[in-house]
Amino acid sequence: VVLSEGRGNIYDCGFLPLTGTVSERYALIEPGRTSYHTLFEAIPAELRTQFYASIQRGSPCLMPVTGAAAARAQYTFEKPVRYQPMPIAQHLIGYLGASGHGVSGVEYAFDDLLTGGSTLTEVRCTMNARGGFIESDAPYLVESPGTGAGVMLTLDSSIQRACEAVGIEMVDKGCIVVLDAPTGRGRASVSLPLYDPENVAASIARQDTSLVNRALSAYNVGSVFKPLLAAAALEQGISAQETYECTGSIEVGGHVYRCAYGRGHGTVDMKTALEQSCNCYFVQLGLRLGAQTV
């Protein structure tokens, strides 16, 4: 009986694992009414049909159990859980589909490598003619190691956790990104709201777009592009003292772009336009420069 097909782990920059750090207990269920009556109520509701079908076939199966139910089971085994109860960097790491392959994030981008790094773990057991376990031959684990390959990120888990804590408290929808200035390496990447990679369906049902990675999504650059336009203009010999009359709106290609609140700034030069974030000044400046120059 397959316990775990495993998967290569994902690590932070200090080689601390971000996946596969926790486990849950699985009971090896022996076919027969004793197992059915003893453990059925302890089996998660979504797995009971599978549990019952296995019992009906007379086949042993593995089911997650906790607490007293685990104590009642004759044989239990630890199975690694891919994601922590409090997941970390879930938008960056991504999640797995029902097939066990990556659907998004690093899980998807490096799926071949992570799948090749997996270790197949099986529970071997010997059955008698009546479909029960042979007591003198206890079930045991057999592992078929993979390459052991994993993926190391530039992420720092301590910085990531700190950013997630701040984001949960302060941000409804948005993102937090921390970069190492000298190297450009990403140390944290948080997108909010968060989602549970072990229960993606619940996030889809919430309809809060929590599956969107806002840290990597495309946005209109807005006013942060204005200093770049100013620098390009100066490089092209356009004087910073040259003035422009802002009326509060400017039309380009049939679309009207407006300044904040639709009010004009009057006569502005480059310095004043930057200070007051004049949209019209920089739209006309961008048109003068052209895309290739910028």
Question: Which residues make up each language-model segment?
Answer:
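Short, glycine-anchored, charge-dense loop/turn motifs used at functional sites
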Residues: 3, 7-20, 163, 179-188
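Carboxylate/His-rich catalytic cores and anion/metal-binding grooves
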Residues: 109-128, 170-190
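Short solvent-exposed loop/turn micro-motifs enriched in small/polar/acidic residues
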Residues: 2-4, 170-171
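Short, solvent-exposed alpha-helical surface patches in non-cytosolic proteins
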Residues: 89-91, 185, 227-228
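A short, polar/charged loop-to-alpha-helix boundary motif
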Residues: 27-37, 194-211
